[in-house]
Amino acid sequence: MQGAKNNIYTVSRLNGEVRQILEGQLGKIWLNGEISNFSSPSSGHWYLTLKDHSSQIRCAMFKGRNQTVSFKPINGQQVLVKGAISVYEPRGDYQLLIESMLPAGDGLLAQQFDALKMKLAAEGLFAADTKRPLPKNIQRIGVITSPTGAAIRDVLHVLARRDPSIEVIIYPTQVQGETAAQSICQAINIANQRLEVDVLLLTRGGGSLEDLWCFNSEALAHTIYNSALPVVSAVGHEVDTTISDYVADIRAPTPSAGAELLSQDSDNKAQKLATALSRLQQSAKHYQLKQERRLSLLEHRLQRQDPKRTLQQFEQRFDEMQLRLESALSNRLHILSRRQQLLASRLEQQSPKHKLAIEGNRLSYLASRLQDALQDKLSQSEQRIQYAAHQLETVSPLATLSRGYSITTDIHNQVADSADKLTIGDSLQTRFRHGQVISTVTQIKLLE
C-alpha cells in the first residue's frame, strides 16, 4: 500500500504522460473518414469530427495549414487527412492535428506519391550532389510536352520575348493518361540519342493530381535521373509538385518560369558583347607591349655578343618573330572577326546594328593602329641593325686595308709594329687588300 501511494498520479501528470506516449509512438499518420460537426469560426481555424461506421475522433486544422486545401470541406464528405495525434491536457481529450487534407479519391494517390517519394529518396535519386548545372550559353532547348497544349505556347512566347536567338526543338509527347509516362520516357530517350540540344524542358500546364499523375511514374523518375542532358521540370502551377520535380536537375514552378530560367535578357547579352570586345582590346595591347619588350631585349644582346654571329642570329630571330607576329595578329583578327560575326548573328533579331557597327569600326581602327605600330617598330629595328653593321664595318681590319694600308707580321704571325724588334735575315709577310708578299730583312734603319 505504501508503494502504491508513492506512485499516485495527478490528473495533469497522467494526461501529460498519455500525451507523450501517443505523440511519441504514433508520429504522423494518414486517416480516412467521413466529416461531421464541421465548423469554421472567425479565427480561420477548422474544427471537425472524422468518423467511420463505429468510431469517431475530434480533429483540428489551423489557419496556416487549411489555406493549402483546394476545396471547402462539408459534412458527409469522405476525405483522407495527414496529421499527428495530440492530447489536449486541460480536458484529457485527444485529437488529430491535421496538416493536409484531400478528397478520398485523391487521397489514395497521395499515399502512393508519398510511398514512391520515400523509395526514390532512399535510392539517392533526389541527392543534391547528383544535380547537374545548366549550360552557361544555351543555344538550343529541347521541350518535352504536348505540341498543342498551353504550355508550349507559354514557353515559345517567353523565349521570343527574352532571347529570340535560342532555337527550340519540340519532342511531342502525351502529358496525361495511362500511356503518357511511357511516351515521356521515349521522348527523353530520343533526345539523349540525338544529342542535338543543350538542355531539356519537361513541361505541361496545371491540372488535378490525377491529371498530373504521369509525372509521378517511377520509370520516368529513373529516365530523368539517367539522362545525359540536364533536365528542368516545369509541371503544373506553383502549388503542384510531382516526382519529376524532385528528380530533375532544376524545378521551375510553371512553364513560363522554366522558359525564363533557360533564357537570358537581351540587355545582358549586349553587356556581355561589350565586355568581350574590351577584353580583346586589352589582350591585343598587352601582346604588343610584350613583343616590344622582347625586341628590345634582342637588341641589347646584339650589342654584347660577337658582331657577325650576333647579326646572323638576330636576323634569323627577327624573321621568326616577324612571322609569328604576323601570324598571331592574323589569328587574333580572324578570331575576333568570327566572334563578332557570331554575336552579330545572335543579336540580329534584336537589331543592335548601330552599336555593332560602332564597335566594328573601333575594332578596325584599333587593328589598323596595331598594324602600323608593329610596322614602325620593325622598320626601326631594321635601321638599327643596318647602322650597327655599318659601325662594325668601319672598324674592321679589312676596311683599313681597303684604304691603302698594309699589315706586316713575322713568322710567328705577330704584327711587326717596330723595327727594333727585327733582325737582319728575318722573314716577313706583308698583307695588302688584294694579296700578300714574303720578304727578308736585309737592312734595319732606326729613326731617332
Swiss-Prot record:
> What GO MF terms are annotated?
exodeoxyribonuclease VII activity; nucleic acid binding
Q: Name one GO biological process term.
A: DNA catabolic process
Task: Recite the UniProt keywords alphabetically.
Answer: Cytoplasm, Exonuclease, Hydrolase, Nuclease
Major subcellular site: cytoplasm
Q: What is its EC number?
A: 3.1.11.6
Kindly list the GO CC terms recorded for this protein: cytoplasm; exodeoxyribonuclease VII complex
List the catalytic activities from the record: Exonucleolytic cleavage in either 5'- to 3'- or 3'- to 5'-direction to yield nucleoside 5'-phosphates
Q: Which Pfam families does this UniProt record tie to the protein?
A: Exonuc_VII_L, tRNA_anti_2
**Location in the cell:** Cytoplasm
The similarity comment for this entry is: Belongs to the XseA family.
PANTHER family in alphabetical order: EXODEOXYRIBONUCLEASE 7 LARGE SUBUNIT
Q: Subunit structure, briefly?
A: Heterooligomer composed of large and small subunits.
Task: Please describe what this protein does.
Answer: Bidirectionally degrades single-stranded DNA into large acid-insoluble oligonucleotides, which are then degraded further into small acid-soluble oligonucleotides.
Q: What is this protein called?
A: Exodeoxyribonuclease 7 large subunit
What species is this protein from?
A: Shewanella baltica (strain OS195)
Gene name, Swiss-Prot/TrEMBL: xseA
